């Protein structure tokens, strides 16, 4: 098998299984350390939005934020960031911080705002409707 061959496994059918790339480790201690490292990186993404050391995804290391944090993954093409910012401008919401990283195929933007949950949810629905959106979610 080569890196260009599709990965097939019966485990791919389960929604509650996360498959990670093979990371070489020839000792029990190395395997345990790798397991802790992978779990830590998944936790940082799910809890904070950080994607440090990502291989096929834009890398972003994020500080903690006390307000609302929204994530937007999109096709890397002109106008997406403008459309995102317009959503908040139309609602009169100031963006406290914004982090953008792209690769050739996709962009990953994290938006921190000081707003209540209703406004954040409304913004999320508008972000999902932006052409080129792959995924958007309200992290917290």
Where are these regions (language model features)?
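A conserved regulatory-domain signal marking ACT and ACT-like small-molecule sensing domains
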Residues: 52-140
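Rossmann-like dinucleotide-binding domain for NAD(H)/NADP(H)
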Residues: 1-64, 108, 140
């Amino acid at each position: 098998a080569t890196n260009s061959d599709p990965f097939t496994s019966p485990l791919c059918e389960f929604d509650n299984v996360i498959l990670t790339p093979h990371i070489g480790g020839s000792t029990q201690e190395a395997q345990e350390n790798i397991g802790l490292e992978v779990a830590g990186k998944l936790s940082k993404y799910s809890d904070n939005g950080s994607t440090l050391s990502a291989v096929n995804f834009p890398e972003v290391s994020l500080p903690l934020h006390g307000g609302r944090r929204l994530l937007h993954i999109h096709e890397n093409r002109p106008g997406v960031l403008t459309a995102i910012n317009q959503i908040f401008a139309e609602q009169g919401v100031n963006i406290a911080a914004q982090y953008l990283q792209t690769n050739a195929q996709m962009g990953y933007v994290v938006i921190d705002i000081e707003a209540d949950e209703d406004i954040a949810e409304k913004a999320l629905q508008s972000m999902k409707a932006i052409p080129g959106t792959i995924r958007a979610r309200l992290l917290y």
